[in-house]
A protein has these predicted regions:
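A conserved beta-strand-loop-helix scaffold within acyl/acetyltransferase catalytic domains
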Residues: 1-98, 115
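Conserved acetyl-CoA-binding loop-helix of GNAT-fold acetyltransferases
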Residues: 99-113
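Active-site/acyl-donor-binding loops of N-acyltransferases
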Residues: 119-160
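Short, contiguous acidic/charged loop-to-helix segments that flank catalytic cores in large enzymes
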Residues: 94-102, 128-133
């Protein structure tokens, strides 16, 4: 289904987006992120929930957790880093239910709408895996579904 249909479905299903700031919220989110990363890629997030909370506390105007909440439960969300002209999605995660009903789509749409007047662009980050060697086509398609475009980073190795 298209992004607009998924966003509408999430709303019909009772998903609401909240910007969360408590330690327990960051822990719940990173637990969800790690479940997804472990299941799909056998890796874990770079940050812990405690580290994300610390970053948020040190930079409250720049680090934000937008969570998709259904029946008082965090089912999806994104952590964004806000810069002068850019908003960067550092983490995005959704459980199975959230994927079915478009809960992450609603969170991303909320971020886009919040920043569209004040930022030049939204940086979805990389779409690669296995040491940044292989393109994750599903992740790339998700980002392109929001109007994102791909760019190529060249990787150079110098033997010194």
């Amino acid at each position: 289904k298209g992004r607009k249909a998924q966003i509408s479905r999430a709303k019909r299903e009772g998903v609401v987006i909240k910007e969360l700031t408590e330690l327990e919220d960051f822990k719940k989110f990173i637990d969800l992120e790690n479940e997804v990363l472990t299941e799909r890629h056998d890796v874990k997030a770079v940050h812990t929930g405690e580290e994300l909370k610390l970053l948020h506390d040190r930079f409250p105007e720049n680090i934000h957790l937008f969570a998709s909440i259904k029946d008082n439960k965090l089912i999806a969300g994104t952590v964004v880093y806000e810069y002068d002209h850019v908003v960067h999605t550092q983490y995005m995660a959704a459980n199975d239910e959230a994927r079915q009903i478009g809960a992450l789509d609603l969170a991303i749409s909320t971020v886009i709408n919040k920043y569209r007047e004040t930022k030049k662009w939204l940086d979805f980050g990389i779409s690669t895996e296995h040491g940044k060697i292989y393109l994750n086509e599903g992740l790339c398609a998700q980002k392109e579904g929001f109007g994102g475009r791909t760019g190529v980073y060249e990787i150079w190795e110098l033997n010194l």
